[in-house]
From Swiss-Prot:
Gene3D superfamilies: 2.20.70.10, C2 domain (2.60.40.150). Regulator of the Hippo signaling pathway, also known as the Salvador-Warts-Hippo (SWH) pathway. Residues 434-456, 523-547, 828-861 are annotated as: Disordered. It is found in: Nucleus; Cytoplasm, Cytosol. The lineage of its organism: Eukaryota, Metazoa, Chordata, Craniata, Vertebrata. It comes from Xenopus tropicalis (Western clawed frog). The keyword Coiled coil applies. Residues 846-861 have a biased composition (Acidic residues). This is Protein KIBRA. The keyword Transcription regulation applies.
Length: 1108
C-alpha cells in the first residue's frame, strides 16, 4: 500500500516550516519530527534490508549549494557527507594504508641516495685537492700522449687541466644536487607524515565530517585559494623585476652563459617570413607586383594551415596515448621502484669514482677501507641486478614512454603556438591587402585549442592540484633510468615517440613510423582534393583563373623528409651507416647487399653519411695523421708490405670505436655516446688488463665537466659500453673544440695508461636532434712506441753500415701523396671540369665503412646530377615566356613562377622541362586591373577569407543564411562533469593539499626575494657581472631565461599561449583517462590526491655557496 494512502496515526499532524519543508507534530508527546510515522510500515528498518538505492528509516538525502549532496540521520540527529549506502570510505582507508607502505619504501631509498651522494662529494673533494697539488708542484714527467707515453699520460697538461675542471664541476654539481635532494627529501618526509596523520585521524573512531564542518573546510580552502592567486601575482611581479635587474649585468657570450640570450622558435620563425608578410600598413607599401605578393601570401598560408592541422592531429593522438598509459599505471606506484634504480646508478657512479681515484697520499688504512667499500658495492650491485624483476622493467618502460610523449606534446604545442602567430600575421596582411578588414579572425576560427583554456596564468584552482602536470624526469635521472631499462631489455624502444636528448638507448635508434611519414608526405607535398579551387572569384590579387596553387617549398618535398631518416636503426634491412671497415680480410663486412641511393640526401647537403676528420689515426682505412686524406684498403696493402716487415706486417687490422654525437639546441647540451669497441688485439693488450674509455672535450672551460670515463670491462673481441655523457656548451663554442677518445687501463700502482686514442674534430657538429654514430680508428700507442724503437734501431744500424735508409713515416707520406695525385688526375679525366666542383670537406671524404672509390664516385655523380638538375630547371624557368593580358603588370613574373609547385621530379632524368602553364592567362573583364568601364567593386570580409580552405559542404541554396564563408564552429552545450562521491577523507586531503601548495608557493616567493636582494646588492656595489652562484646554477638559468622571454611582448604571448595549451592538454588527458579507464573515477581521483603529497614540484632551489 502506498504511504500517502495510509492515514496518519491518531494524534499526528502534518505541517510545513517557513522554507516549505514538511514536518510532523505528535500532539500526544508534544514533539515534532522530520520522519513520517507511516514510514515504519513502508521503508526498510536497516541498511541490510534495503534494495537498490533505498535509504532506511530515518535517513534523508539533501543538497547544499556549497557542499553538494549530504545525508541526514534523523535517528541520531546528525549529518554526514558520505553516502551511507556505499562502502567507498572503507576502501579509501585501505588504499591509503597501502600507499603509505610504498611511500615509506621510496623515502628510505631516497635517503640512501642522499648518503651515496654524500660519499661521492667527499671523494670528489679529496680528488680535487690531490689534482691541485699535482698541478702546483708539477709532479711527474709531462711527456706527450702522441709519443706513446704510458704511466705519465696521467699528467698530460691538457688532460690534467680537464681532470681538474671536471672534478671541480662535479663537486659543485654534487653540492647543488644534494641541496635539491635535501629539499625533495624534506618535502616527501613532510608529505609522508601528513598522510600518516590523516590516516590516524580518519581511522580513529571512524571520523566523519558533519555539514557545518564540511562548510568550514570549504570556506578555508576558498581563502587559501585567494591567497595562492595573490601569491602567483606576486611571484610574476618578482620575476619581472628580476628580468629588469638582470639586464643591467654583462653576460659573457663566448662561454656557456650564452644560454641567457636565447632566441625562441617564434623569433626565428618570424624572421623566416618575408618582409612583405610583416608589413601590413598599406597596399602601397608592398614592393613588386600585387598579384605576385598575394599569391605568395596564399601559398604560404595554405602551407602553414596544413602544418597546423597536422600538428593538431598529432596532439590528439598523443593525448590518447598518454591517457592510456596513465590509466594502466596510477601515479606514485613507480616512485619507489624508480628510486631503487637511481640508487643502483648512484652506487655505480660511486664505484667508478673509487676505481679511478689516485690514493697516492692516503694512509694504508684509508686504502684498505676504500678496497673493502669497493667490494661491498660490487656485491650490492650484483644482488640488485639479480633481483630486478621483469614486471618492474615493463612498468619503467611505460614510464619512459610517457616521458617521451610528454616531451613530444610540449614541442608540438610550441609548434602550434608558432604557427598560430605566423597564420595570424599572414591573415592580417592578406586582409589589409584585399579588403582592409580588421585583424583577429584567426582567433575565432582557429583558436580551438587555446580558447578551451582561457584561464589566467595566475588563477588557482584546488582541482588543478591533482591534474598531471605532464612533467618529465630530470634529464640526468632520465638517462640513468633509460640505461637501466636497457639492461633489462636490450634494444627496447617505445613505439610512436620521438628521439630526444634525454634518451640513451644507443643500441637501437628511434625511427618515425613510415606510415605517418608517408601520410605527412601526401598531405604536404601532394595536391589534396579539397584544393581544387583556392583563388577567390572576386579578388584583384588573383593572377589566374581559379586553380590549385602549386607551392614550391623545400619543406614540402620528399627530400626534406629523407633528411630526417635515422640512419642508425639496425632493424632496417638496408642500413645506411653500419658499413664496417674491412682492413685486411673478411673480419668486417657490409651489412647491406646493395648501395642505397643518396641523391635525395645530397640535394639538401645532408652530412649524415660523412665522417669528421680524425687527427690521431694513421691506421688502416682512416685519415692519415692530420691530413684528413682517405685511402682505400687495396691501395694501402702493397705500401704496408713494402714499408713494414716481420711481425708488423701481420697487423692488418686496427682498433675501432663507435662514437655517437648529438647536439641539443634547446638545452645547449652536447651528448657523446660511447657505444662499442672492436678489434682490441690491435692495441697489443697484456693479459688480464681491464679497459675503459676516456672521453674529453678539449679545450676545457673551468666551469664545465669535460672529461668522462666509462665503466671498466674485461677483455673481449667486442666491448659494448652504451654510455652517454653530456657537456654543457654553446654550439659556437663547441665548433672550436676537439673530442679526444682514449682507450685506457689502470695499472697496479693506480697509474692510468692509454693504449690507443683518436682525436675527432667537432667543427662539423650540426644542430640535428638525431644521433649520428660513426666508427673511428684508434691509434695504438704501444704499436707506435714499438715502431719508433724499431726505426731507431734501423737508423743506428744504417749509420754504422753507412747505408742511408729513409724514415718509415716519411716514405709512407710520400707514397700517400703520389697515390692521391694519381687519383685526382684520374677523376679529373673522367668528369667535366667546367660543370663540377669538388666540395670543400665532407663530400670527398666517404664514410669509414669500407665504401670503395667507385661507389664514392657514383654518389658524387648523383649529387652533381641533382644540383645540375635544379640549376637547369631554374634557368629554364627564368627564360620561359608566358602569355598575359596586355594590361597585366609583368614586373614580378619570376616571383609568381616561384610560388607554383612543380610536378614530382624524376632523378633519372638529368634535364627535365620546368612546369609551365600551357594555356593563355585570360583575366575576367569585370575585375581586370585596368579601368575598362565604370563599375563598382565591393570587397567584403567573406571574399577576403574565401581564399582559405573551406571545410564546409558545397553551397546549397536556401540551406542557411549566407552571411560568411568562414568556418562556423558548432555550438557545444557544456555538460557538467559527473559528480564524484566525496567523503570526509577526500575533504581532508583537499584541505591539506591546499595548505601544502600555499606553503610551497610562499617558499618560492622567499627564494625570489632573496635572489632579488642579491642582484640589487651586486648592482649597488657596482659589479658588472652576475653573481657566480646564479651563473653556475642551471635551474636559475632556465628560470631567468623564461623571465627574459616574458619581458618581451611577443615572446610573452607566445610562451603564455604554449603554456595554456599544455594546461588544456593536461586536463584533456585527465578527462580521457577517466573515460578509458576500467576503474571508477573516484579511485583515480583518490590515487592522485595521495600521490600529490609524495611527488614534489620543486621549481626553485635555495641559494647555496660555490666554494669547493
Amino acid at each position: 500500500m502506498i504511504r500517502k494512502e495510509l492515514p496518519l496515526p491518531e494524534g499526528w499532524e502534518e505541517a510545513r516550516d517557513v522554507d516549505g519543508k514538511v514536518y510532523y507534530i505528535d500532539h500526544t508527546s508534544k514533539t515534532t519530527s522530520w520522519i513520517d510515522p507511516r514510514d515504519r510500515f513502508t521503508k526498510p528498518l536497516t541498511f541490510a534490508d534495503c534494495i537498490g538505492d533505498e535509504l532506511p528509516l530515518g535517513w534523508e538525502e539533501s543538497y547544499d549549494t556549497q557542499v553538494g549532496v549530504y545525508y541526514i540521520d534523523h535517528n541520531s540527529q546528525t549529518t554526514q557527507i558520505e553516502d551511507p549506502r556505499v562502502q567507498w570510505r572503507r576502501e579509501q582507508e585501505r588504499m591509503l594504508k597501502d600507499y603509505l607502505v610504498l611511500a615509506q619504501e621510496a623515502l628510505l631509498a631516497q635517503k640512501e641516495i642522499y648518503q651515496v651522494k654524500q660519499q661521492r662529494l667527499e671523494l670528489a673533494q679529496k680528488e680535487y685537492r690531490t689534482l691541485n697539488d699535482v698541478w702546483k708542484h708539477k709532479v711527474g714527467s709531462q711527456t706527450s700522449l702522441v709519443s706513446g707515453s704510458s704511466s705519465s699520460s696521467k699528467y698530460d697538461p691538457d688532460i690534467l687541466k680537464a681532470e681538474i675542471a671536471t672534478t671541480k664541476s662535479r663537486v659543485n654539481k654534487l653540492k647543488r644536487e644534494m641541496v635539491f635532494l635535501r629539499q625533495e627529501l624534506q618535502y616527501k618526509e613532510n608529505g609522508y607524515q601528513t598522510l600518516k596523520e590523516i590516516d590516524l585521524k580518519m581511522s580513529k573512531n571512524h571520523c566523519a565530517y558533519k555539514l557545518d564542518e564540511a562548510q568550514a573546510i570549504l570556506n578555508e580552502m576558498k581563502t587559501i585559494k585567494k591567497a595562492i592567486t595573490s601569491g602567483e601575482r606576486e611571484k610574476q611581479d618578482l620575476i619581472q623585476s628580476l628580468a629588469e635587474l638582470k639586464n643591467g649585468f654583462l653576460v659573457d657570450k663566448g662561454s656557456q652563459s650564452d644560454l641567457w640570450a636565447s632566441n625562441t622558435s617564434l623569433a626565428s620563425s618570424a624572421n623566416s617570413l618575408s618582409r612583405q608578410y610583416l608589413n601590413v600598413s598599406s597596399q602601397t607599401d608592398i614592393s613588386g607586383n600585387l598579384s605576385v605578393v598575394s599569391n605568395n601570401h596564399l601559398a604560404e598560408k595554405v602551407r602553414l594551415q596544413l602544418r597546423y592541422e597536422e600538428a593538431k592531429r598529432r596532439i590528439a593522438n598523443i593525448k590518447i596515448q598518454l591517457a592510456k598509459i596513465d590509466s594502466d599505471a596510477w601515479p606514485g606506484v613507480l616512485d619507489s621502484e624508480r628510486d631503487r634504480l637511481i640508487l643502483i646508478s648512484e652506487k655505480e657512479e660511486l664505484l667508478k669514482e673509487m676505481r679511478f681515484i689516485s690514493p697516492r697520499k692516503w694512509s694504508q688504512s684509508e686504502v684498505e677501507r676504500l678496497e673493502s667499500e669497493k667490494k661491498q658495492l660490487e656485491e650490492d650491485l650484483q644482488a640488485a641486478r639479480d633481483t630486478q624483476s621483469k614486471a618492474l622493467t615493463e612498468r619503467l618502460k611505460m614510464s619512459s614512454k610517457r616521458n617521451q610523449l610528454v616531451k613530444e606534446l610540449e614541442e608540438t604545442t610550441r609548434l602550434i603556438a608558432s604557427l598560430q602567430a605566423q597564420l595570424k600575421c599572414l591573415s592580417t596582411s592578406m586582409q589589409s591587402l584585399s579588403s582592409g578588414s580588421s585583424p583577429g579572425s584567426l582567433a575565432s576560427s582557429r583558436g580551438s585549442l587555446v580558447t578551451s583554456s582561457q584561464d589566467s596564468s595566475t588563477s588557482a584552482s584546488v582541482s588543478d592540484l591533482y591534474y598531471e602536470q605532464l612533467d618529465h624526469l630530470d634529464s640526468e635521472y632520465q638517462n640513468k633510468v633509460d640505461f637501466l631499462i636497457q639492461e633489462g631489455a636490450m634494444g627496447y624502444r617505445p613505439s610512436g615517440c620521438i628521439t630526444t636528448i634525454h634518451e640513451n638507448e644507443v643500441v637501437r635508434s628511434q625511427k618515425t613510423d613510415p606510415a605517418n611519414r608517408v601520410k605527412a608526405l601526401r598531405s604536404l607535398s601532394g595536391t589534396p582534393k579539397s584544393m581544387t579551387s583556392l583563388s577567390p572569384r572576386s579578388s584583384l590579387s588573383s593572377p589566374s583563373p581559379p586553380c590549385s596553387p602549386l607551392v614550391t617549398d623545400p619543406l614540402l618535398t620528399v627530400d626534406a623528409f629523407l633528411s630526417q631518416i635515422d640512419f642508425e636503426d639496425i632493424d632496417l634491412p638496408l642500413s645506411f651507416t653500419e658499413l664496417n671497415v674491412n682492413a685486411g680480410g673478411d673480419s668486417y663486412q657490409h651489412e647491406t647487399d646493395e648501395e642505397p641511393s643518396g641523391q635525395g640526401l645530397s640535394c639538401l647537403g645532408v652530412s649524415s653519411l660523412s665522417v669528421a676528420g680524425v687527427s690521431a689515426a694513421v691506421s688502416d682505412e682512416s685519415v692519415t695523421g692530420d691530413s684528413g686524406v682517405y685511402e682505400a684498403t687495396n691501395q694501402r696493402t702493397l705500401m704496408e708490405n713494402a714499408v713494414f716487415d716481420g711481425e708488423d706486417s701481420e697487423m692488418m687490422d686496427t682498433a675501432k670505436i663507435k662514437i655517437g654525437m648529438k647536439y641539443d639546441e634547446k638545452n645547449k647540451h652536447f651528448a657523446v655516446f660511447v657505444i662499442q669497441l672492436d678489434n682490441l688485439a690491435a692495441l697489443l693488450l697484456h693479459q688480464n688488463e681491464k679497459l675503459y674509455i676516456r672521453v674529453a672535450v678539449l679545450p676545457c672551460s673551468e666551469s664545465t665537466s669535460c672529461l668522462f670515463r666509462t665503466r671498466t670491462l674485461e677483455q673481449s673481441d667486442t666491448l659494448l659500453y652504451n654510455e652517454m655523457f653530456l657537456v654543457s656548451t654553446s654550439h659556437s663554442a663547441l665548433r672550436q673544440k676537439t673530442l679526444r677518445v682514449d682507450v685506457c687501463t689502470r695499472q697496479s700502482n693506480h697509474h692510468e695508461e692509454c693504449l690507443g686514442g683518436s682525436q675527432i674534430s667537432l667543427a662539423d657538429v650540426c644542430h640535428s636532434e638525431e644521433q649520428e654514430a660513426h666508427w673511428y680508428n684508434l691509434l695504438s700507442y704501444r704499436y707506435l712506441k714499438r715502431q719508433s724503437k724499431t726505426s731507431k734501431q734501423k737508423i743506428s744500424c744504417c749509420e754504422e753500415s753507412g747505408i742511408e735508409n729513409p724514415d718509415s713515416v716519411s716514405a709512407l707520406l710520400k707514397q700517400t701523396a703520389a697515390e692521391l695525385e694519381a687519383v685526382r688526375k684520374q677523376i679529373g679525366e673522367s668528369t667535366d671540369p667546367p660543370e663540377y666542383i669538388w666540395p670543400e670537406k665532407k663530400d670527398n671524404v666517404p664514410d669509414e665503412d669500407g665504401i670503395s672509390e667507385n661507389e664514392g664516385e657514383e654518389e658524387f655523380d648523383g649529387d652533381v646530377q641533382c644540383e645540375t638538375e635544379e640549376s637547369d630547371m631554374q634557368a629554364a624557368t627564368d627564360s620561359a615566356s608566358v602569355k598575359v593580358d596586355k594590361e597585366t603588370n609583368t614586373e614580378g613574373l619570376a616571383m609568381s613562377l616561384s610560388s607554383v609547385r612543380p610536378k614530382d621530379k624524376r632523378a633519372a632524368t638529368p634535364m627535365q622541362a620546368p612546369f609551365i602553364r600551357g594555356n593563355t592567362i585570360i583575366r575576367s573583364k569585370t575585375f581586370s586591373p585596368g579601368p575598362q568601364s565604370q563599375y563598382i567593386c565591393r570587397l567584403n570580409r567573406s571574399d577576403s577569407e574565401s581564399s582559405t580552405l573551406s571545410k564546409k559542404p558545397p553551397f546549397v541554396r536556401n540551406a542557411m543564411e549566407r552571411r560568411s564563408v568562414r568556418v562556423k564552429r558548432p555550438s557545444v552545450k557544456s555538460t557538467g562533469s559527473e559528480r564524484l562521491i566525496r567523503t570526509s577523507l577526500d575533504l581532508e586531503l583537499d584541505l591539506q593539499a591546499s595548505r601544502t601548495w600555499h606553503h610551497q608557493l610562499t617558499q618560492e616567493i622567499s627564494v625570489l626575494r632573496e635572489l632579488k636582494e642579491q642582484l640589487e646588492q651586486a648592482k649597488r656595489l657596482g659589479e658588472n657581472e652576475l653573481p657566480q652562484r646564479v651563473k653556475d646554477d642551471e635551474t636559475f638559468k632556465v628560470m631567468l631565461r623564461q623571465v627574459e622571454k616574458q619581458v618581451q611582448k611577443i615572446e610573452q604571448k607566445y610562451e603564455m599561449q604554449a603554456d595554456k595549451m599544455m594546461r588544456a592538454a593536461a586536463k584533456d588527458v585527465h578527462r580521457l583517462r577517466g573515460q578509458s579507464s576500467k576503474e571508477p573515477l573516484e579511485v583515480q581521483s583518490f590515487r592522485e590526491k595521495m600521490a600529490f603529497f609524495t611527488r614534489p614540484r620543486m621549481n626553485l632551489p635555495t641559494l647555496t655557496a660555490d666554494d669547493v
